[in-house]
């Protein structure tokens, strides 16, 4: 599991309770994990985190661009992400006359938002364990190369049904040192527009020096908006597109927090060594 993977995971952090720290796939939250979360202060039904039939948090957390995490915060397609995640798009939109990287940018209306060509936002549709399917032809005598070829071949067979829709992206991802295989399906939106970015003096304050320090003092955020067609489906850029209405958006609280409050993060981490043995 050292390789890059993009699948929605939950990170639980509770001050002073080290044994409860860790990262889990949302669909693998079991009764024990759910019970412990409630003991620590989680107050919602567990299916409010991940559901394939009802709106849930997984519908608000997105893959932004090539692998960053973003979150939907409004019923009009607003996405919050990091400044460094939007950096390339902001750079491409900048010019000598309008240096948005240096000076920042704020849109006052839908019409002023800037289309970010090539930028995508992907919403998770479903996750499915297909281990039994892709390993069904394996033999104990298979070499590692033969094993990989068989699994890859059946993975491609399984993904065939998604190839006709260019706005769906499906991929098979191995987990737990290739002992589990999941197919994850995303709806990919290709009309994404810049709404707000702070100047780099704020968004990139401290650079890489401060990047590994805590607390940090950088305003590392930017705001984009996802647009959809008139049927609220994914589409290429068009002036006729309208702000996307997500299945679920996360309310922003101004109440702050107090010591020992329950805390968790949902997103797309780059990698994890959870459950990795000392043998690697």
Where are these regions (language model features)?
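Terminal presequence/propeptide segments associated with secretion/organelle targeting
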Residues: 8, 16-280
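Positively charged n-region of N-terminal signal peptides that target proteins for export
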Residues: 1-4
């Amino acid at each position: 599991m050292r390789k890059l993977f993009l699948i929605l995971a939950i990170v639980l952090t509770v001050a002073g309770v080290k044994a409860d720290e860790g990262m889990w796939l949302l669909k693998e939250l079991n009764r024990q994990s759910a019970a412990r979360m409630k003991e620590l202060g989680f107050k919602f039904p567990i299916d409010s985190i991940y559901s394939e039939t009802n709106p849930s948090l997984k519908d608000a957390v997105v893959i932004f661009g090539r692998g960053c995490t973003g979150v939907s915060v409004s019923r009009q397609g607003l996405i919050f992400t990091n400044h460094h995640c939007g950096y390339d798009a902001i750079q491409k939109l900048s010019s000598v006359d309008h240096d948005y990287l240096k000076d920042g940018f704020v849109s006052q209306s839908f019409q002023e938002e800037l289309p970010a060509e090539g930028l995508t936002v992907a919403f998770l549709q479903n996750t499915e364990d297909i281990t039994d399917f892709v390993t069904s032809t394996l033999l104990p005598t298979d070499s590692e190369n033969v094993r990989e070829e068989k699994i890859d071949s059946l993975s491609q067979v399984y993904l065939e049904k998604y190839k006709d829709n260019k706005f769906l992206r499906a991929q098979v991802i191995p987990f737990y040192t290739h002992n589990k295989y999941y197919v994850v399906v995303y709806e990919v939106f290709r009309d994404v527009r810049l709404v707000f970015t702070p100047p780099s003096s704020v968004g990139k304050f401290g650079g890489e020096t401060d990047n590994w320090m805590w607390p940090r003092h950088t305003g590392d955020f930017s705001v984009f908006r996802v647009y959809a067609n008139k049927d609220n489906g994914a589409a290429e850029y068009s002036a006729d597109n309208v702000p996307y209405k997500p299945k679920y958006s996360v309310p922003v609280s101004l109440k702050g927090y107090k010591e020992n409050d329950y805390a968790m993060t949902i997103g797309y981490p780059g990698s994890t060594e959870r459950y990795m043995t000392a043998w690697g």
